[in-house]
Amino acid sequence: MSSSTVLNTLRSKHPKLALLQTCSSFTDLKIIHGFLIRTHLISDVFVASRLLSLSSNSTEYAHRIFSQIQSPNLFVFNLLIRTFSTSPEASKAYNFYTQMLRLCIPPDNITFPFLIKASAEMECVRTGEQIHSHVVRFGFHNDVYVENSLVHMYATCGLIASAGRVFGAMSFRNVVSWTSMVDGYCKCGLVDDAREMFDEMPHRNLVTWSIMINGYAKSNRFEEAVELFEVMKREGVVANETVMVSVVSSCAHLGALGVGVRAHEYVVENGMGVNLVLGTALVEMYWRCGEMEKAVSVFQELDEKDSLSWSSIIKGLAVHGHGHKAVGFFSEMVRLGFVPRDVTFTAVLSACSHGGLVEKGFEIYEMMKRVYGIEPRLEHYGCIVDMLGRAGELAEAERFIEKMPVKPNAPILGALLGACKIYKNAEVAERVGNMLLEVKPEHSGYYVLLSNIYACAGKWEKIESVREMMKEKLVKKPPAWSLIEIDGKINKFSMGDDHPEMGKIRRKWEEILGKIRLVGYKGNTEDAFFDVDEEEKETAIHMHSEKLAIAYGMMKTKPGTVIRIVKNLRVCENCHTVTKHISEVYGREFIVRDRNRFHHFRNGLCSCRDYW
C-alpha cells in the first residue's frame, strides 16, 4: 500500500491530518507535531515521515522527530540523510547511514547521491571514496544519478582524474554528467580542458553555459568570457542573472564600455530583475569603464543596497579623483544605518588620499577603530601613508610607518616611494627603497620607480647598481600592454607589437607627435632610465603601448569621440605628459585606467593633478 493511500485512510479517521498537506510555517509544523504526539499517530511511520519531510529546514527538529519513530524505514533514513547532507552538519548524514545499515536496511539509488553530496560539501575525499566503494558493493555503480554525484564530488574535491575515470566508465551520460566535468575542470583551473569538453557536449543547458563563461571570468580570461556569451546568444540561449554577472564583470576588467552597455541593454530587454549582485556588478562595470556618472545613476536606482554595493560606489569615486563626493556617499551610508566593513574604510580612506583630505582621513580612520571596532589592516595603513605622502608630509609618513604595530608591506613602502618621486626627495627614497627591495625583491615596478627617482637626480651610478641588482635577482619588468575597444572589439597593444595596421598606426603617431611639438612638447625621457643618448631614449618611449592605443583610437574614431584605454601598469610620466598635450591640441577627452587609478585628460589637464 502506498504512503498516500495510508495517509488518506488515517485522515478519514483523524481529519486534522489534512493539515499535513497545507502546513506552511514552522509554527504550524509544531502544532501538528503536538497533535500527533497526543494522538499517538507519531508512531505511524507514514505520518511521521510526512512530518519529517516538512522539517527539512531544521536539522535539530528533524532529529527530534526521528527519535520518536519506533521503526524507521528506508524512506525515513533517506529524508534524514538528505536534510543533513545540505546542512552545516553534513557529517551526521553518515551517522544515519551507518545506523541504517545496522538495522539491515539496504540503501537505494536515492541514498547515495545525498551521501556523496555531503562528502562534496565537506570536501572530504576519504569519506567520499568509502561511499564510492559502497556504491559498487550495493550495485549502483551504473546508476546515472549516482555516477553524476560521484563525478561532481571528485571534481569538487580537486580530483579531476578520478572524476574523469567515473565519467569515462559511464554507459549513459546526460547533460548533468557533462556539466559536472566542465565544472570540475574550471574549478581546477583547467579552463582549456573544460572548453574542449564543453565543445564535445551533444547538448548544453543554461547551467553549462553559465559554468563555462564563469570559468573564463574567474581565470582572468575576460575576452573569452565575453566571446562565449556572444556565441550563446547566437545559439538562441537566453542568459540569466548569473551569466550576466560574469559577463558584466568581464567587461569591467577589460574596460569594454560598449560591450558592457550592450550587456546592460540585454538585461533590460530580457526582463531580468536586477538583483543586488547583478546591480553591484553593473555599478562596478560603469566606473571601471570610466563612466562614473552612469555608475552613480545605476547605484541610485538599485532597489536594494548593502555594504558591498556602497563600498563599490565609494571606491569608484575614489579612483576617479572625486574625494569629496566619496566622503559624502560614505556619510550617507552611515546615516542610513548601513554598517561599513573594512573594505568600505579602505575605499573611503583612499578617497581622502586622492582628494587631499588629510584631516578628514584621520577622522574616518579613528572612527573605524573607535566606533566600529575594526582593527586597521595593512590596506588601511597604506591609505594613511599614501595620504600623507600625497600631501608632501614625507617625514610624517615615515613616523607613521615606524609606529605601526606590524611591519610595513610593499604597497605601503611603495606609496611612500611614489611620493618621494613626486617631491624629488632622493634621500628618503634611497632609505625607503632599500627597505622595499628587501620586502619585495621580485617586484620589477619598484626597481623602475627607484631608478626613475635616481634619473631625476642624475645619479646614473645608482641606476646602474639598481640594474645590477635586478640582473642578480633575475627580476624582469613585465611586458606592458594597453587595451582599447573599437566597435565592440577589444584591441591589445604592446611594444614591438605586430598589429596588422602597425604601419598606419606609426604614421598616425608621427603626425600626432609633429602637432604637439608645435605647441612646445619635448619628450621627457626620464622614465627611460637607461644611460643612453637622448635620441635613443625618445625612440623607446614613443613605442609605449598606450601611445599605440591612442594613435589607433584616433585613426578609428570620429573627432570628439572619447577614447578609453586600459593599461596593466602605471602610466609613465612621458605618456602622461603626451596625453595631456594631445587632449589640448585635438580637443579630445581621454580616459585612461592604469594600475593605480583613472586619468581623465581634458583640455591639457589630468584629473590626477599629476600625482598618481
Predicted feature locations:
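Terminal (and in a subset, N-terminal) low-complexity or junction segments at the ends
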Residues: 1-174, 179, 183-205, 211-612
